[in-house]
Amino acid sequence: THLTTLTEGATINPFDNKVVIIDEAHNFVSRIVNKLKSRKKTSLSVKLYEYLMDAIDCRVVFLTGTPMINYPNEIAYLMNLLRGPIERVLINTSSVISWDEGMMTSFFRTLKDIDTIEYDSIKRLIKLTRNPPYFETILNEKGERIAVKYNKDFPQESDILKWVDTWRSKFQEKVSGIELNPLEKLQKEDLECLPTKFEDFANLFLDGLNIKNALLFQRRIQGLVSYYKGADERLVAKEVNPDKRLVKVPMSTPQFLRYLEKRWKEIQMDSKKGRSKTELGEDFSSYRTITRLACNFALPPELDQKDISKEQLQEEDFQKQELDAFEEISKDPRKFLTLENLNNYSPKMLEILKNIKKEIGDGPYFNKQFIYSFFTTLEGAGLFGLVLETNGFQKYKLIKEQGIYIEDPSLKPGVPCYAVYSGENVDERDYLRQIFNNKYSSDFPTTLKQSIKEPNRLCIFIASKAGAEGINLVNVRNVHIMESQWNPAIVDQAIGRAIRICSHASLPLEQRTVDVKIYISVFSEEQQKSIDGPNIVPIRRNDTMLKRYDVEQPTDTFMTTDEYMYDLAYRKGRISKNISLLLKQSAIDCEIHRKLHSKEQPVIQCMRFDTTTKSEDLAFKPSYLLEEKDTLYLRNIIRKSRQLQKIRIKGLAMILDPVTNDIFDFVAFEDNQRLLKIGTKISPTEIHFLV
């Protein structure tokens, strides 16, 4: 493999002394967590993770707009990769006549690469961490550390255990009465910036859907994050009615009964596996797959497969196994997919169809529609293509003549077309995307381009999860998400296919809008209370749980699988947004971009340490286990009151503390009364500004 070549047969670390840049880093981290959860520790992503964590003098740069995809503790893996392992050496003593911590600290402060110094007087143990490579400590005249400075010529032994031997003899000379253990008896710890184990992360930082110990989280990630909002909002299409994204579609009676049959099978399977139904740290990619499909389309009994194995459930696109049923529907689609029949088998698809007909407008310039489904064929993207074809639309087709692609001349003029972005022919898929966008690359076949009679006829683009990744669409006016997902990142990625920088630049200003709809099947009021149906009582008992979305207070509700998935995504989304806010507030450039980000909601209040904090104080301790929780940390902060004055110097407004002569930024003070020190008044006519 390529990794074997890079590592020369696992004999070297390819990331030693390297700068590693990873785009879309959330995908990389998510794969690591998924593989570790499934105990696949030999997978490529896990091996890369281990090589990065073990690399010597490696710098990692991650580019991402998404802090987490599936699990809240993904952010811990991401931050740990950026920070690297916090190496700490544990130095036992073989002989102690006099344990003088002050004398030892005085010696250690002469070593320019020491970061933290800790002692265990009972075990006679010294614990030391070091600055990153090439960073040396700067001391003031009192011997206090006031800064660290990069110095490319500053040497450092890469092995922290061997490093002890570089100063051992000097220590014995300066500190009498203490004998250090030899190198072979020293120990090294690799500490984490944040806990990666889900239970540990949740216990330390999660409080329901909120974040606890936010200050602790922010202190430990200091210096790791940069945040810039990005392009001018005027370059991005605006989503209209974002508060009306969710479309709840009540089930029909036939669909409800079919749903109950399938749900009972799932409950029995879950009970055998002992599966939890509310754990945020669980993989839901194959959870309730049978009823997720039933929420889209309730197959009539004569077409439904009798049994679905456990192995099939582990395949996210297992619906391919139901191609026989799909082919049966294809033979006589009017039997199942007319408006009347859709009302029985899939009220949800009927609702999507109605909205498309309402929004698509009149030709020849149809409003472009993007339809996304997690599922590929039956009950998903492929089936909805048949729904369109049965109800006044036509499938866009390319044909080959003598090896050359052209538009199918048999297409009906003036009838809007759809295309499903699937299939193994990569070229054909990309041609369809370019025709939909009406924007062609330089290598697009000239013959095909000349054969296109109505450039805007292909106006409906359907894609599944597998197909939607990485594609860019242009001038989409409506996005239809066919089912709820188990995490909001999937929905955001799908919407991101249609709303991109300058994706609507060719439209008039008033048309640069996108309406997004997420459709979920729900129980009607009658079905919520019904006692008629197979196994309805045990199903209701099992599936009644706290509903948190779309309610003022969490309420026990009998929810469909669609609703449950949406509620799960809502919970994950709340946590993700809260973590994202902490990242933005902790960014090293937060103050620099404060004005640019001033319109964001919730408001970004840049993290800052208390004004009594001294330069030698630590932002965080090496081990998160020894950190003060926020309640104790805040209790120990010395609270001071100041009488401040607003002054103007050469027309510039500033804030002055007349007692200390500290000068603070006026704009920052207006922003939630934040005191951002920018200098010191040293005379009535002179100010020394911080550099």
Regions inferred by a protein language model and the residue ranges of each:
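Helicase motor interdomain insertion/brace
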Residues: 1-472, 511-530, 536-632
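Short conserved active-site loop signatures built around small residues
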Residues: 479
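Conserved SF2 helicase motif VI
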Residues: 487-509
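The feature captures the C-terminal accessory region of ATP-dependent helicases
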Residues: 596-691
